[in-house]
Amino acid sequence: MKFGTFLRLLKIENAQNAFANLKKNSFSCCHLVYKPDVYTEEDARIVKAAADENRIEISALFAGYKDDFTKWNLYSDFEDAGINSAKYGKERIEYLKQAAVFAKNVGTENVLIHAGFVANNPFSEEYTVMVNLVKEVAEYLKALGLNLLLESGGESPIVLKRLIEDVGTGNVFSNLDTANLIMYGLGNPVDAAYTLGDLIKSVHIKDGMPPVKPRELGKETEFMQGFVDFPRVFSVLKDNHFDGPYIIEREISDESAAQKIAETLEQLKKMLSA
């Protein structure tokens, strides 16, 4: 069973220390977040060498967007987030294609993205646009031998499954974020684990609360202090024969972050070995 966390690499010269720190803290894998102005082969070589030396598997490149127009809310992000943004989508897809080559060069098989909000109505123009855009990215990745993982949250689980089936390239899967579904107010991870089944390639371990303000996401909490029913989530994942990677994600930024992640890892191992 594989356990990891996020590795947010801000400067390429920090790669060796960053991967060594993961090894020191008993992680065997990570989701890499690296968003340079331009992806280069040399940067990929440095990252791969650091990961290999420390025996850390890069389970996915979490390919964000270079811009900062996404606000992570339930209002402006319907227009501004994701690859389906009329204003920013085209530029983001081109950046993702750079990221895909980088992912190939660092040795991972998976590129993970926030695609954007997905329309419920399969006959709507918005839904058709999203299918076509995801297909464009997925086909580009498939030519490189890569999978596209869609982060859960901005749609109900059954809508995400429909989208994956309608794209139909065979290399599109889901990353189940246990808190996002609750924080977006669009579902819960127990149902999602059941609905998505073997489409789940990785899981983000995160806890949170439902939204109460119509324009704002629910709040993230510490592990086991929110609305996520982790024992039931893990039970359903076990029934699906999912064996990891489990990636601890903590977006709460404070001085106790490293300690809290270490504590979550210990709790997680105990729960999954029970």
Functional labels for PLM-detected ranges:
Residues 1-6, 60, 64-81:
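N-terminal small/glycine-rich loop or linker at the start of catalytic domains
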Residues 28-34, 57-61, 109-113:
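Short, well-structured secondary-structure segments
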Residues 35, 66, 116, 153, ...:
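Flexible loop residues that form catalytic
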Residues 48-65, 131-144, 230-233:
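Alpha-helix-loop-beta-strand connector modules within alpha/beta enzyme cores
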